[in-house]
């Protein structure tokens, strides 16, 4: 089988014959060369295969560097874009600012009237002009007296508000419009009483105006814009409806009945007064010592009147007005100012009373401004103030539904012309409370709902009302007993007579309230110290001693007779006062200095 194998002799013979025909190269060398070539290719491929991971790493590193570079360039590009955008916006803003600064100035005017051809009348630069309106402005929204902005061509380009500054003028009369559908007009007077006619701005024309109102006026445009509150009167007048009731006042039943007859009956039963041809009183004078309830009564009258009017008319909102005049503040160093304030106060009262609402004008400390004419030491301002009040009370202009109530500690100093019948008709003396009156006043401040000490409650079987009544009884007995402890003063009259005055002679509702307040404060301190809550009788008795001790220095005056008159002691002139206080830390018999001619500062 040798002849079947490749490369055998038969093949060799064929090869020799073929080679002999044209090929002289050795076939084995060619194969060897091809084998070497293939081996080199394999080695090259092996080297490439070996070098491939390293190249991949290099390429990956270059790719990462390229990506980072791209990110940096992108971020820088974004910053440049943002910077360019900001620069562009700044350039635009600067261009707008330059354009705005380069614009000609705009003028302002006051709108007067509008017309169908899209033109309006305005008042600008002291002239009345008819100008066009920009399409961006709604001509129907313009109101008389409103400010408008004009461009360089005098075209209305913007609507403003209403003027808020100007002169304050007094309204004399509201006039009819100058033309049909035109602006309302008013006659006003300036600070020099110079009268002029002005237009009323639309917001003001919609309000109800009365003669005497203060108006804000632009004299150049000729418009009145708003009603100005009368601050000078508001400072002097407390316009309110008090919440004090007659039930809150103790010990003054007779006086309350008198003032109700004088004030409430004419308002509530005007038909009966007309039937009997009885004229209601114009004024009431409440006089008496300090702290006895004069102001409280006046407030209670206003509150009661409001309730009575509401019940009579069926209107829940019906009310009365209480004009509380701060007497000494009426005085003004400028001549005629005090009289003008009085006129304005009564004008305000007439305005409030014009619709049937009761108005009470209350003058506290009446002697300070309406004292007897000719009694002034440094000046005689009362010579004009008193006649002004008299003319307001019973002058040509009547006071309908207005009643004047005056309160004073020194009624002897008030001008007699004010006190005569027909002016302050009713004079009610508010006296110091007696023992029964003091009990009634105590009952207003000591009520069963207060904390009461357990020992005091146990004494009356836990009955709180009985305990309170007993506490009040003990306290009043201690205050009003004629004992050495209650002696206050020894006064010597001009005729040589002497009289001992007790603390009860100077008691008042204000003093009783102060005693109760002291006792309540002592009860609070007792709770903090002993942890035993409740008010006791001893607290009230100690409060009486403390109150009397504090009042020991009060009569120290260089004119004892004047002090006695203010305190309610009338009669023989007092020339000498000696204290008789024997309370704690007090020495009996201290003499009050009654020196005279001590100078104006005393």
UniProtKB/Swiss-Prot annotation:
Transmembrane recorded as keyword: no
Region Disordered, residue ranges: 1-33
Gene3D superfamilies: 1.10.8.60, 1.20.5.170, Nucleic acid-binding proteins, P-loop containing nucleotide triphosphate hydrolases
Biased composition (Basic and acidic residues): 1-13
Record has Nucleotide-binding as a keyword: yes
Coiled-coil segments on the chain, per record: 28-103
GO MF, one example: ATP hydrolysis activity
SMART domains documented for this protein: AAA (SM00382)
Residue numbers binding ATP: 291-296
GO cellular component, one term: proteasome complex
Pfam families: AAA, Prot_ATP_ID_OB_C, Prot_ATP_ID_OB_N
GO process terms (BP): modification-dependent protein catabolic process; proteasomal protein catabolic process
Biased composition (Polar residues): 23-32
Subunit-level organization: Homohexamer. Assembles into a hexameric ring structure that caps the 20S proteasome core. Strongly interacts with the prokaryotic ubiquitin-like protein Pup through a hydrophobic interface; the interacting region of ARC lies in its N-terminal coiled-coil domain. There is one Pup binding site per ARC hexamer ring. Upon ATP-binding, the C-terminus of ARC interacts with the alpha-rings of the proteasome core, possibly by binding to the intersubunit pockets.
Recorded family membership: Belongs to the AAA ATPase family.
Protein name listed in UniProt: Proteasome-associated ATPase
Organism expressing this protein natively: Saccharomonospora viridis (strain ATCC 15386 / DSM 43017 / JCM 3036 / CCUG 5913 / NBRC 12207 / NCIMB 9602 / P101)
């Amino acid at each position: 089988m040798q002849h079947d194998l490749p490369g055998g002799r038969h093949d060799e013979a064929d090869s020799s014959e073929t080679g002999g025909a044209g090929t002289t190269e050795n076939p084995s060398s060619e194969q060897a060369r091809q084998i070497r070539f293939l081996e080199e290719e394999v080695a090259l491929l092996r080297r490439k295969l070996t070098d491939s991971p390293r190249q991949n790493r290099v390429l990956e590193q270059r790719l990462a560097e390229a990506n980072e570079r791209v990110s940096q360039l992108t971020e820088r590009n974004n910053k440049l874009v943002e910077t360019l955008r900001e620069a562009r916006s700044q350039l635009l803003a600067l261009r707008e600012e330059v354009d705005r600064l380069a614009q000609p100035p705009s003028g302002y005017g006051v709108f007067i009237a509008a017309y169908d051809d899209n033109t309006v009348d305005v008042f600008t630069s002291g002239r009345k002009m008819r100008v066009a309106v920009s399409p961006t402005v709604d001509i129907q929204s313009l109101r008389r007296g409103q400010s408008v902005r004009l461009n360089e061509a005098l075209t209305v380009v913007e609507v403003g508000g209403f003027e808020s500054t100007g002169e304050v003028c007094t309204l004399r009369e509201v006039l009819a419009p100058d033309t049909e559908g035109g602006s309302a007009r008013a006659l006003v007077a300036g600070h020099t009483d110079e009268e002029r006619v002005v237009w009323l701005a639309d917001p003001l024309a919609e309000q109800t105006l009365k003669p005497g109102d203060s108006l804000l006026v632009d004299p150049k445009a000729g418009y009145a814009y708003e009603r100005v509150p009368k601050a000078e009167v508001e400072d002097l007048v407390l316009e309110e409806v008090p919440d004090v009731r007659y039930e809150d006042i103790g010990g003054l039943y007779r006086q309350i009945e008198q003032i109700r007859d004088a004030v409430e009956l004419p308002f509530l039963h005007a038909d009966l007064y007309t039937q009997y041809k009885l004229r209601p009183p114009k004024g009431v004078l409440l006089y008496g010592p300090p702290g006895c309830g004069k102001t409280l009564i006046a407030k209670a009258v206003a509150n009661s009147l409001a309730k009575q009017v509401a019940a009579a008319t069926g209107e829940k909102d019906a009310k009365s007005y209480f004009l509380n005049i701060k007497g000494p503040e009426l005085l003004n160093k400028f001549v005629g100012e005090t009289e003008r304030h009085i006129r304005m106060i009564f004008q305000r009262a007439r305005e409030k009373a014009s619709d049937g609402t009761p108005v009470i004008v209350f003058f506290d400390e009446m002697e300070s401004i309406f004292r007897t004419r000719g009694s002034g030491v440094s000046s005689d301002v009362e010579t004009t103030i008193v006649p002004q009040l008299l003319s307001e009370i019973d002058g040509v202009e009547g006071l309908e539904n207005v009643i004047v109530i005056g309160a004073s500690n020194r009624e002897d100093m008030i001008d007699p012309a004010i006190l005569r019948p027909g002016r302050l008709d009713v004079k009610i003396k508010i006296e110091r409370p007696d023992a029964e009156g003091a009990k009634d006043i105590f009952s207003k401040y000591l009520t069963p709902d207060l904390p009461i000490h357990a020992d005091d409650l146990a004494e009356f079987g836990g009955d709180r009302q009985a305990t309170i009544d007993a506490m009040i009884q003990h306290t009043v007995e201690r205050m009003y007993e004629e004992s050495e402890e209650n002696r206050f003063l020894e006064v010597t009259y001009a005729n040589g007579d002497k009289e001992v005055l007790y603390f009860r002679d100077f008691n008042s509702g204000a003093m009783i309230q102060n005693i109760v307040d002291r006792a309540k404060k002592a009860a609070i301190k007792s709770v903090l110290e002993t942890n035993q809550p409740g008010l006791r009788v001893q607290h009230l008795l100690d409060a009486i001693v403390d109150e009397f001790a504090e009042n020991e220095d009060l009569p120290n005056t260089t004119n004892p007779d004047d002090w006695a008159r203010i305190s309610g002691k009338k009669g023989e002139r007092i020339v000498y006062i000696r204290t008789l206080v024997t309370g704690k830390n007090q020495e009996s018999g201290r003499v009050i200095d009654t020196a005279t001619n001590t100078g104006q500062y005393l």
